[in-house]
Each structure stands twice: as C-alpha cells, then as structure tokens.
Amino acid sequence: MSLFHLIAPSGYCIKQHAALRGIQRLTDAGHQVNNVEVIARRCERFAGTETERLEDLNSLARLTTPNTIVLAVRGGYGASRLLADIDWQALVARQQHDPLLICGHSDFTAIQCGLLAHGNVITFSGPMLVANFGADELNAFTEHHFWLALRNETFTIEWQGEGPTCRAEGTLWGGNLAMLISLIGTPWMPKIENGILVLEDINEHPFRVERMLLQLYHAGILPRQKAIILGSFSGSTPNDYDAGYNLESVYAFLRSRLSIPLITGLDFGHEQRTVTLPLGAHAILNNTREGTQLTISGHPVLKM
C-alpha cells in the first residue's frame, strides 16, 4: 500500500476528530501515515508557528522515503506568509528525482503555483486529510479519482460540460481562484502560455467570482490560455438583490469577452465530490455535444 506524509502549512485543524478519522481510515485501508503530530499544532489561527509550518515544506527536500504521498491536512489561511522563505530551489531539485506526490487544494494552491513557477514541479490539486479523507463518509467518486490520478501515467476524466464544441491542448494549471488572484504580480505566479486553466472557489458571491475572473482577464492571463475549465463554486448562492444574476450570468459575460472556450460543470473544488488534477501536467480537452473529456499525462505516479 502507500505511505502518506502529512504537512500543515496553513490553518489550524479545528476539526481534530475529522483528522483522526482520516488517519484511521487510511491506516485501516493498509496505508502508513507519518508526521501525524502536525494536526495538533496551533499558533493563533495557524497550524503552528511560521518556523514550524515552513519546516513542513522545506523538510520535504530532505525526505528520503520512496514512493511517498505528501498530503496537506487542510487549507484555511497561512501559506501566503511562507512564500518568501520557502527553499524553492531545494524543493525543485528534490522533485527532479523520485518525486514526491504532493496533494492539496484551497490555500495550498499558493504553494503549488510557486513550485510550478520556480521549476515546473507538478503537484496534485485534490483531496486533503480533514475535509475529504476525514469526512463522515469518504466520497467514492473522490477516492476513485484520487487513485486514478496517482496510479496512472495517462488517464481521462469525463463529464457533461457546458460550453462550445472545442479541442484544446496544453499545460493544465490553476486551482483556487482567490489564491491565484493573490499571486498576480509576484514571483509565485506561473507564467503559462497556451495552457488549460482550471479554477474553483468557495463562499464567494457570484459578483466576486466575476470580479476575480475579470482581474485574470484584464491582466492578460485568460486571453493567453487555450481554454478555461470552471469547477465548483460552493456557497455562491445569489440573493434577492441580484434579481436573477447568478453564476450562469457570470459565465455568459465572460464568454462574451473571451475568444477561447470556457467549459463549466467539472466536479472539482471544495465539494465532497471532486476529481484530482495534476497541475503542470499535459492535458487534452475535448468538448462535444456528447460530453467532455480531459485526458492528462506527463505527471509523476506511484511506483507499483
């Protein structure tokens, strides 16, 4: 089975019972889980001091255990504080041989983007310990797609997407929309041309989602891509003031401005049902009336 190494670079794990349930669920399945002490750390709202959380990341360059899945405990906030002090060069060098399979989402997007920007390091945007493996019930779709991505050098995700008939090919990248916005103009924002940009978020009103997408558009980032895929935007319910304005309104307005395809409907993000995407891998997107396919390759996988 597999070895999981936990890291907690972001928010304090307030749901300790869920973290313990996630560890138990993984061990019951025959996996080994290391570095479990990080789940109890706390300094203010963070999962430990800056020094402790930074060491979670920098120590990965010295991690010698082979075939290891590095799993973020949770998101929240905290990764942005660490970006200037992460030893990116050492992490990039480490990933060039026997790469760790690094997985997380939400606030962790900042670290994933930094690794991609500094050395084209591929990481996995997917489930985390508390929210997913530690849920009351582990979602079967999420579990299947996690192992699908980590065990197969080439795999395909299928869904019924909304958008124009299209075919696009390029580097798959993105993650949490708010975190990408926070990186614009910094050394940790990947400079990817002709890519396939995939985005998701949580607890953002539709007008805030639109404002962030327009910031990417006005910054020239969206027009430089081959395609955009939008995942879930949990907790984005409009109110009476919106008078019919909703996420579909956002998508329609963006499509009126973009000359590239925008495809929606992917189960990707903060919901219990989510795919796992290797950010930085090669992807081919096909969208037709019959459905949508995203074929991904070129990412590190577990050695079976």
Swiss-Prot record:
Active site: S106, E200, H270
Superkingdom in the source lineage: Bacteria
Reaction equation(s) it catalyzes: N-acetyl-D-glucosaminyl-N-acetylmuramoyl-L-alanyl-meso-2,6-diaminoheptanedioyl-D-alanine + H2O = N-acetyl-D-glucosaminyl-N-acetylmuramoyl-L-alanyl-meso-2,6-diaminoheptanedioate + D-alanine
One function term, GO molecular function aspect: peptidoglycan cross-bridge peptide endopeptidase activity
Description of the deletion phenotype: Bacteriolysis during the stationary growth phase. Cells lacking this gene also accumulate UDP-MurNAc-tetrapeptide, an unusual compound that normally is not present at significant levels in E.coli cells.
Record keyword Cell wall biogenesis/degradation present: yes
Compartments (UniProt record): Cytoplasm
Pfam families named in the record: Peptidase_S66 (PF02016), Peptidase_S66C (PF17676)
Leader peptide range in chain numbering: none
Gene3D superfamilies attached to this UniProt entry: Class I glutamine amidotransferase-like, LD-carboxypeptidase A C-terminal domain-like
Annotated keywords: Carboxypeptidase, Cell shape, Cell wall biogenesis/degradation, Cytoplasm, Hydrolase, Peptidoglycan synthesis, Protease, Serine protease
GO cellular component: cytosol
Single GO BP term: proteolysis
Pathway: Cell wall biogenesis; peptidoglycan recycling
Keyword Cell wall biogenesis/degradation: yes
EC number, UniProt record: 3.4.17.13
Regulation: Inhibited by beta-lactams containing a D-amino acid side chain.
Enzyme class: hydrolase
Primary location group: cytoplasm
Role: Releases the terminal D-alanine residue from the cytoplasmic tetrapeptide recycling product L-Ala-gamma-D-Glu-meso-Dap-D-Ala. To a lesser extent, can also cleave D-Ala from murein derivatives containing the tetrapeptide, i.e. MurNAc-tetrapeptide, UDP-MurNAc-tetrapeptide, GlcNAc-MurNAc-tetrapeptide, and GlcNAc-anhMurNAc-tetrapeptide. Does not act on murein sacculi or cross-linked muropeptides. The tripeptides produced by the LcdA reaction can then be reused as peptidoglycan building blocks; LcdA is thereby involved in murein recycling. Is also essential for viability during stationary phase.
Protein family (similarity comment): Belongs to the peptidase S66 family.
Name this polypeptide is given: Murein tetrapeptide carboxypeptidase
Lineage summary: Bacteria, Pseudomonadati, Pseudomonadota, Gammaproteobacteria, Enterobacterales
